[in-house]
C-alpha cells in the first residue's frame, strides 16, 4: 500500500523537490530581468533588499529576487581574475538549477546532500547572501582553516561585489582582529574557532571590550555529517595548567608494561601449544570426521578461544582463523561460554589470564590472578582495588567514643586522603593498561617531536590540538617514553552538539548524509534532502572482493594496481590508518610501482599531492584524509583512458566514509570506477559480521588467492555497518542526554555572567546578591541546620567573621519569620557595603585627582570581583561534574538509572554552586581595598587600577583543546 501511494503521489523527497523547482523557475526569471541593469544598479539591490526587510518583508518572499541577484553577479564575473590561496584563477561559475535548488533547501533549514564536484561551495553563497540582509550574524562553518580561507577568497568575492563584508577566522587570529571579523556580514571559519570564541567570551573575557562575538543567527555547516556526527562526542575545552603534576603514570608505567608482557607470554604459549596440535589440519579444506580427532581439535580451539580473550590480535590465532571450520569451532566455544548456564565455567577458564580484553566493546578487566600479580609488582594489597565507602568509614569514626573531636577530624582527613590516593592509582593503572592493550601507534596516534598526536579516525588527519581525556593521553606518553605533561584544568567546555543549538537557524551540506538522516532529525531537527546531480554519474561500482586472509587481500590489491596502472588510469588507494598506508607502500616499492603516500605523517603536502592525483598514471595511497573538501581533477589524458580508479583496502565502520571514498572519482560526469577489497581478518568482519557469513565461508571457500564476490556479500557487509552505526548512534544519543544536563547549567551561569558584564548598575547586582545571602543566613538561623560542618552556635561567629556587621542570633530569632530576619540582615549588609564603597571612591579620588573617574573605576572593580568568583566556582563545579559523571555508572549495580541519578545529583551540585558563588562574592565585596600610588600620568593610572584586582588571578597560558573521549576509541 505504501509503495502504491509513493508511486501515485511521489516520495516526500520528490514532493519537496517539485515544490522548490517552482522557486528555481522564479529565480531564473529574476536573473533575466536583472540583466539590463548596470553594475551599480545591481549593487544597489543589496541596500534595497535590506530596507525591504527592515520594513517588514520576509526573507522567504525576497528569496527569488535575492538568488536572482547572486546568479546575475556570477554571470557578470565570468572571466574576471580571482586570487585564491596565492593562485591566480579566473571566475568560471554560474549556478546551475540544481545548485539553486540546494540553496533554497539550505535557507529552509535542510541538510542538502550534493555529490562530489556538484558545487556545494557556490551553492552556499545564495543563502548566505539572503540571510546576511537581516544584519544578523551569518557563519559558514568548514572542516579546516584552509577551506575557510579558500572559500572566503573564492566565492566570497561574489558577496563583496554586492557590498557585503566577509571575514575569515583561522587559528592564531588576534583578539582585536577577531572583533573586526565578527562585525562582517558573513564570517567563514571552522567549528572549533567559532566554538572556542563562544567559550572565551563567556568564561575568559572579563570586560565587554574583550568579547568578540555578536550572536548566533544563521550557520551553514560544510561537511555537516563530519562535524555534527563524527565530532559529536568531542567537546571543545579551554584549559589552563593544573595545580600539580600527577606522578602515577611515571611511577607505574614499567610495572604495567611488565604485567602486559606476562599476558602476552602466557597467550603466546597457549597459542603455540594449540598450533602444534592443529598444524596438520591447517592446509586441508575439510576436517576429518573421526569423532576422537574432532574432539581433540575442539579442545585446541577451546584454548584458542581463551587466547582470543587475552590477545585478540595474536598471530597464531589469526592464522588458525583463516580456516573456516576452525574459525567456526572457536566461535562455537564463544557462544558456549556466553550462555548463562556456562557462566561459572567461563569465569574459571578466564581466570587463567591476567587480563580479559573485550575487543568488541573496546574494554578490558583485570582478573584475580592479574590483581595478585600487580600486587607483587607494585606492593600493597588487593584492597587497593576496592573503593572505600566513605559514608560507612565516616560513621565508624563518628561512633568511636574513644576518639576526641580533633582526632575524629584528623582521622576523617586521613581516610579522605587514602581514598583519593586509591582512586588516583586505580585510575592511573586503568589508563596505562588501556594505552598498552587498546591504543595502537600509527592507528590511533603518531609520535612526533616528543609529543603524542591523535589521528582522527574518520579523516586520517593528525589533530595536534587534541588530547585524550581522563589521563589517557598521559598514559600513552608514558607508554611511548615521551615527556609526560601535566594534567590541565578545565576552564570552560561545550560539545559541538550543544554549541550549534545556539543558532536560530541551521543548515548543512555534504556528499553523504542520507544514511544518518534519522540522527539529524531526532537530535538536531534537521531534514536531509538529496539534490539531483547536474550530469548523470558515470562511476562503475564493482562488487567487493573478499579474501580469507589479509595476505591474500594485499596480494590482490597490488595485482589490481599493477593492472590498472598499466592502462594509465590514475589510482587512489584508500586506507584506514597510517600503519596500513605505510605497509601497502612497502609492498608497492617491492613491486617497483611508483606512488605517492598521503597520511597523517606528511599531511602538509596534501594540496600538492591531491593536485597531482588525477594525472595519467598517478598512484596515490592515502588514508581517509583525502575524503573531505578535496576534489581530484583529471587531466584530459586520464579522462580518455577511463578516469580515476578508486581502491578501498577495507570497509570502514561507517558507510559514509566508504561513500566519501567512492565519491573521489566520477565527478561532474567524468568516468571512473571503485572497488573495495576485504579479508575476513578485517576488524569490521571480525567484530560485527553476521554469523551467516561464517556459514557461507565454510560452504563456498575458494582456493587460496581467489576472491569471493557477490552482491549477497555486499549486503551482509552493509548489515554489519548498520549494526555499528546503530551502536554508535545510541552512544552519541546517550552522551547528549548527559551533556544536556550540563548545557542547561552552562547557559544559566553564562547568562548570569553576561548580566554582570552588561549591567548598567553593578551596585544593584551587588545588593541583589547580598539579599540572597541574607535570606540564606535567615533560613539557617530559623532551622538549626548544619552549615558547612558548623552547628548553630558557630553560625554567629561565621557571620561576623565573613561580614563586618554585628548580629545577635538570639535577638534575630525573636523576629516573626525568615523574611523579617532576612530583611534586617540585608539592610545592615547593604548599608555597610554602601559605606565601604563610598569610602573606597573617596580614597581613590583623593589619590588620583579630579581627572580620575573614581566611581566608574570602583564599579569596574566590583564587576571584576563578581566575574572572577563566578569563573572560579564554575571551574570547581566542572571538576565535580566530571567526577559525578565518571562514578554515576556504578549506580546500575543498585538497580538505579544512572541518568536519573546524574540529573538529581547534578541539580544538587548546581544549587550548591549558586550558593557558593553568592557567598563568595558577598564575602569578597567587603574585602575590597584599592591603593593608588601618586602618578602624574593619570591616563596610565586608570586602566591599572581598574584591572589590577582581577589580574591577580593567574590563569596561566590557556590551552584550546579538543578532547577526545577515551571510551569512544573503537
From Swiss-Prot:
Cellular component GO terms, alphabetical: cell envelope Sec protein transport complex; cytosol; plasma membrane
Major subcellular location class: membrane
Keyword Cytoplasm: yes
Membrane topology of the entry: Peripheral membrane protein
One GO molecular-function entry: protein-exporting ATPase activity
Domain of life: Bacteria
HAMAP family to which the protein is assigned, alphabetical: SecA (MF_01382)
Protein family membership: Belongs to the SecA family.
Name assigned to this protein: Protein translocase subunit SecA
Amino acid at each position: 500500500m505504501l509503495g502504491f501511494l509513493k508511486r501515485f503521489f511521489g516520495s516526500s523527497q520528490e514532493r519537496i523537490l517539485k515544490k522548490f523547482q517552482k522557486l528555481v523557475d522564479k529565480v531564473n526569471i529574476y536573473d533575466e530581468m536583472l540583466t539590463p541593469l548596470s553594475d551599480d544598479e545591481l549593487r544597489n539591490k543589496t541596500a534595497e533588499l535590506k530596507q525591504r526587510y527592515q520594513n517588514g518583508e520576509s526573507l522567504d518572499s525576497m528569496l527569488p529576487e535575492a538568488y536572482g541577484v547572486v546568479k546575475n553577479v556570477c554571470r557578470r564575473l565570468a572571466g574576471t581574475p580571482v586570487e585564491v590561496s596565492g593562485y591566480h584563477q579566473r571566475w568560471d561559475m554560474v549556478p546551475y538549477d540544481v545548485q539553486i535548488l540546494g540553496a533554497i533547501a539550505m535557507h529552509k533549514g535542510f541538510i542538502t546532500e550534493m555529490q562530489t564536484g556538484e558545487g556545494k561551495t557556490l551553492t552556499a553563497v545564495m543563502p548566505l547572501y539572503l540571510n546576511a540582509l537581516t544584519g544578523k550574524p551569518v557563519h559558514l562553518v568548514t572542516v579546516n582553516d584552509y577551506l575557510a580561507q579558500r572559500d572566503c577568497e573564492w566565492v566570497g568575492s561574489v558577496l563583496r561585489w554586492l557590498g557585503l563584508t566577509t571575514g575569515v577566522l583561522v587559528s592564531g587570529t588576534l583578539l582585536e582582529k577577531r572583533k573586526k571579523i565578527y562585525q562582517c556580514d558573513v564570517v567563514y571559519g571552522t567549528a572549533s574557532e567559532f566554538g572556542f570564541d563562544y567559550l572565551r567570551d563567556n568564561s575568559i573575557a572579563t570586560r565587554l571590550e574583550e568579547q568578540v562575538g555578536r550572536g548566533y543567527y544563521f550557520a551553514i555547516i560544510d561537511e555537516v555529517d563530519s562535524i555534527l556526527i563524527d565530532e559529536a562526542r568531542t567537546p571543545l575545552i579551554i584549559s589552563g595548567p593544573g595545580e600539580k603534576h600527577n606522578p602515577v603514570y611515571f611511577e607505574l608505567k614499567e610495572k604495567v608494561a611488565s604485567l602486559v608482557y606476562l599476558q602476552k607470554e602466557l597467550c603466546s604459549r597457549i597459542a603455540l601449544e594449540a598450533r602444534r596440535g592443529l598444524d596438520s589440519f591447517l592446509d586441508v579444506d575439510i576436517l576429518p570426521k573421526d569423532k576422537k580427532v574432532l574432539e581433540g581439535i575442539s579442545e585446541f580451539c577451546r584454548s584458542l578461544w581463551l587466547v582470543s580473550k587475552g590477545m585478540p590480535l595474536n598471530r597464531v590465532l589469526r592464522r588458525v582463523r583463516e580456516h573456516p571450520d576452525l574459525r567456526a569451532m572457536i566461535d562455537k566455544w564463544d557462544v558456549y561460554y556466553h550462555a548463562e548456564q556456562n557462566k561459572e565455567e567461563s569465569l574459571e577458564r578466564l581466570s587463567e589470564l591476567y587480563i580479559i580484553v573485550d575487543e568488541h566493546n573496546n574494554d578490558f578487566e583485570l582478573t584475580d590472578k592479574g590483581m595478585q600479580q600487580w600486587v607483587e609488582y607494585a606492593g600493597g594489597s588487593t584492597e587497593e582495588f576496592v573503593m572505600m565507602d566513605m559514608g560507612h568509614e565516616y560513621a565508624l569514626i563518628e561512633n568511636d567514643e574513644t576518639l576526641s573531636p580533633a582526632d575524629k577530624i584528623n582521622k576523617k582527613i586521613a581516610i579522605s586522603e587514602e581514598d583519593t590516593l586509591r582512586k588516583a592509582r586505580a585510575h592511573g593503572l586503568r589508563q596505562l593498561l588501556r594505552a598498552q592493550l587498546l591504543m595502537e601507534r600509527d592507528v590511533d596516534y603518531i609520535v612526533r617531536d616528543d609529543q603524542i598526536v591523535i589521528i582522527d579516525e574518520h579523516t586520517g588527519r593528525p589533530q595536534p590540538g587534541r588530547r585524550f581525556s581522563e589521563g589517557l593521553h598521559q598514559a600513552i606518553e608514558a607508554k611511548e617514553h615521551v615527556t609526560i605533561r601535566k594534567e590541565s584544568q578545565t576552564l570552560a567546555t561545550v560539545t559541538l552538539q550543544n554549541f550549534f543549538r545556539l543558532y536560530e537557524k541551521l543548515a548543512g551540506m555534504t556528499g553523504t548524509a542520507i544514511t544518518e538522516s534519522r540522527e539529524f532529525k531526532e537530535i538536531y531537527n534537521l531534514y536531509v534532502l538529496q539534490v539531483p546531480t547536474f550530469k548523470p554519474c558515470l562511476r562503475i561500482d564493482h562488487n567487493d572482493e573478499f579474501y580469507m586472509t589479509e595476505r591474500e587481500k594485499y596480494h590482490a590489491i597490488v595485482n589490481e594496481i599493477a593492472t590498472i596502472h598499466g592502462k594509465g588510469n590514475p589510482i587512489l588507494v584508500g586506507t584506514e590508518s597510517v600503519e596500513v598506508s605505510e605497509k601497502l607502500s612497502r609492498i608497492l616499492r617491492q613491486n617497483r610501482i611508483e606512488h605517492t603516500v598521503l597520511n597523517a605523517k606528511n599531511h602538509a603536502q596534501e594540496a600538492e599531492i591531491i593536485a597531482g592525483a588525477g594525472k595519467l598514471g598517478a598512484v596515490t595511497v592515502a588514508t581517509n584524509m583525502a575524503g573531505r573538501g578535496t576534489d581530484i581533477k583529471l587531466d584530459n589524458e586520464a579522462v580518455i583512458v577511463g578516469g580515476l580508479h578508486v581502491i578501498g583496502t577495507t570497509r570502514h565502520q561507517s558507510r559514509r566514509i566508504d561513500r566519501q571514498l567512492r565519491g573521489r572519482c566520477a565527478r561532474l560526469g567524468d568516468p571512473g570506477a571503485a572497488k573495495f577489497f576485504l579479508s575476513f581478518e578485517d576488524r569490521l568482519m571480525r567484530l560485527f559480521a553476521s554469523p551467516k557469513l561464517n556459514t557461507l565461508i565454510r560452504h563456498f571457500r575458494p582456493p587460496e588467492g581467489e576472491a569471493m564476490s557477490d552482491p549477497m556479500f555486499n549486503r551482509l557487509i552493509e548489515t554489519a555497518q548498520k549494526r555499528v552505526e546503530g551502536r554508535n548512534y545510541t552512544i552519541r544519543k546517550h552522551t547528549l542526554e548527559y551533556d544536556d544536563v550540563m548545557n542547561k547549567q552552562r547557559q544559566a551561569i553564562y547568562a548570569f555572567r553576561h548580566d554582570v558584564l552588561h549591567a548598567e548598575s553593578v551596585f544593584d547586582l551587588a545588593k541583589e546578591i547580598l539579599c540572597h545571602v541574607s535570606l540564606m543566613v535567615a533560613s539557617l538561623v530559623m532551622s538549626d541546620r548544619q552549615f558547612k560542618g558548623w552547628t548553630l552556635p558557630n553560625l554567629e561567629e561565621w557571620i561576623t567573621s565573613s561580614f563586618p556587621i554585628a548580629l545577635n542570633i538570639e535577638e534575630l530569632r525573636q523576629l516573626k519569620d525568615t523574611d523579617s530576619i532576612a530583611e534586617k540582615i540585608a539592610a545592615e549588609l547593604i548599608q555597610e557595603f554602601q559605606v565601604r564603597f563610598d569610602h573606597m571612591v573617596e580614597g581613590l579620588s583623593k589619590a588620583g585627582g579630579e581627572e580620575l573617574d573614581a566611581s566608574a573605576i570602583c564599579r569596574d572593580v566590583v564587576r571584576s570581583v563578581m566575574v572572577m568568583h563566578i569563573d572560579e566556582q564554575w571551574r570547581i563545579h566542572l571538576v565535580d561534574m566530571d567526577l559525578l559523571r565518571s562514578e554515576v555508572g556504578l549506580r546500575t549495580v543498585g538497580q538505579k538509572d544512572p541518568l536519573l541519578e546524574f540529573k538529581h545529583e547534578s541539580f544538587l551540585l548546581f544549587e550548591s554552586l549558586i550558593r557558593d558563588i553568592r557567598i563568595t562574592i558577598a564575602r569578597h565585596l567587603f574585602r575590597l581595598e584599592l591603593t593608588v600610588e601618586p602618578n602624574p600620568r593619570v591616563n596610565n593610572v586608570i586602566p591599572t587600577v581598574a584591572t589590577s584586582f582581577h589580574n591577580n588571578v593567574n590563569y596561566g597560558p590557556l590551552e584550546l583543546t579538543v578532547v577526545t573521549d577515551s571510551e569512544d576509541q573503537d
